[in-house]
Amino acid sequence: MALLEIQGLTKKFGGLTAVNNFDMVVEKGEIAGLIGPNGAGKTTVFNTISGIFKPSSGKVLFKGQDITGFSPHNVVRMGLVRTFQITTVFSDLSVLENIRLGSHLLAKLSFWDDLLTTPYQRRKEKELFAKAATLAEFLGLGDKTNELAKNLSHGHQRALEFAIALASDPEMVLLDEPVAGMSSEETQEMMRIIRATRDRGVTVLLVEHDMKMVMNICTNLYVLNFGNKLAEGNPQQICANESVISAYLGSEYKPKC
């Protein structure tokens, strides 16, 4: 069943066509990848899906509903969240406080609940902090809940950003270069987290340049080049595709297929 479907997506910036007539289908429960050279249009696709950009033409469907042009806030409310290339956490808040902020859409607190600190508000806050602690444990941050985010390693900050995204109980998460700048050990841990997230019922679409990671974790791949879809298929098909090898992977990658 298609959870996310992109139909004929085009995004132009003045005379530049960043993405041209792009189609993509992500099935519920899969880990899909969007790959290609720098400047290929991958982040533009993510920004259009998540409501940061409005497309010049085409549609974005999520759970069968047309969400084209939805605001980022409303896209999140639909159950579709994303992370960014640059780590975005609240540096001077603790790990637990950061994750709690990610669940603000679940709080359903009225103005009076917040103003008067009602019993419902206190109970809800307790529940959300307990959930934040559970997510911290799931993301390998269980022993760091009271640490300030700015004191975490790069790998742990990326895990925290992932936890913040998961705190809103999404059905799908978009990961923009989740292992960029990570060590081999940190990359393996992030792969474990992504697979475990999929196993919890969350569909994943990622952009990543670490081809070893992508080929090991993704079930289906889409390749962009100069804004155009160059290829799609499973990892074995993609790494054996001559056009993809020529435009992106390089000839030295072919023997690894």
Task: Describe these PLM feature segments.
Residues 1-257:
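Glycine-rich phosphate-binding loops of nucleotide-dependent enzymes
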